[in-house]
């Protein structure tokens, strides 16, 4: 049987997964909600549901890799602002459950690694990437190697304080870039403005509890000239 590999992007809103063959071609994909507000074991259960939905009898699962937001140390999630994992042994639990090697890294670092190895950054010795989603992450390649610093979070610009008296961030600080310009923050700003009587094309979406605006919605409304969207996005 041919070896197959599973890659996961574990975010604060959703978990994306893909099954790859030995040549790195995608065989199939899967997506589940993270359910990040329901506790660490519920999140792990969602991760396992994605993995189980991807497994294929035509090949042998050889390894699992995952990118997770936050501070990672040897496969343990020391802290993740957008998930309820704290000092959580994710790598160990995946190995125990699936009996294959598992590799866990900071999501921005592993995303940049993919861009550097296979995308527009291929061949570059030095590269910086920033990623905006539920939070804001960043990765750095220096002299052909991922530069993570002592805790693996050297590129984490999302937790740079840019407005000292700003909104409370998931990390516990105030005024982090993530608390001002992530999709979660942008959604909160929209909600606040709508509650004050401002008009936007997102009013129906924002009426759904816990809804986070999608990038495609923001882009469409921005190019369409939604005045509140243009104002909020330019500020972010």
Show where each model-derived region lies.
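Short glycine-rich, Thr/Ser-proximal phosphate-binding strand/loop in the N-terminal lobe
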Residues: 2-45, 76-77, 152
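Glycine-rich phosphate-binding loop plus the immediately following alpha-helix
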Residues: 15, 104-108, 162-200
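Glycine-rich phosphate-binding loop and adjoining helix at the ATP-binding site
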Residues: 36, 40-48, 52, 59-64, ...
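Short beta-strand segments
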Residues: 9, 65-69, 105, 129-135, ...
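Glycine-rich phosphate-binding loop of actin/hexokinase-like ATP-binding domains
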Residues: 120-180
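Residue-level signal for inorganic ion chemistry
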Residues: 17, 66, 94, 186
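Adenine-nucleotide phosphate-binding core of ATP-dependent small-molecule kinases
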Residues: 30-31, 35-59, 177-179, 187-236
């Amino acid at each position: 049987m041919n070896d197959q590999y599973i890659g996961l992007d574990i975010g604060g809103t959703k978990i994306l997964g893909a099954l790859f063959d030995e040549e790195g071609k995608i065989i199939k994909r899967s997506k589940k909600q993270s359910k990040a507000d329901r506790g660490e074991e519920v999140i792990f259960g969602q991760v396992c549901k994605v993995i189980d939905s991807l497994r294929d009898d035509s090949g042998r699962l050889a390894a699992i890799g995952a990118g997770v937001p936050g501070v990672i140390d040897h496969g343990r999630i020391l802290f993740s602002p957008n998930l309820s994992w704290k000092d959580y042994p994710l790598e160990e639990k995946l190995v125990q459950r699936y009996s294959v090697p598992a590799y866990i890294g900071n999501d921005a670092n592993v995303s940049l690694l993919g861009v550097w190895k296979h995308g527009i950054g291929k061949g570059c010795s030095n590269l910086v990437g920033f990623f905006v989603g539920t939070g804001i992450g960043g990765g750095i390649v220096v002299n052909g190697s991922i530069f993570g610093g002592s805790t693996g979070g050297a590129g984490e610009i999302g937790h740079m304080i840019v407005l000292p008296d700003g909104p409370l961030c998931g990390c516990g600080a105030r005024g982090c870039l993530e608390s001002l310009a992530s999709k979660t923050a942008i959604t909160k700003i929209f909600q606040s403005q709508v509650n004050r009587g401002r008009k936007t094309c997102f009013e129906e979406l924002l009426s759904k509890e816990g809804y986070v605006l999608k990038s495609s919605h923001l882009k469409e409304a921005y190019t369409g000239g939604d005045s509140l969207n243009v104002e909020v996005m330019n500020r972010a």
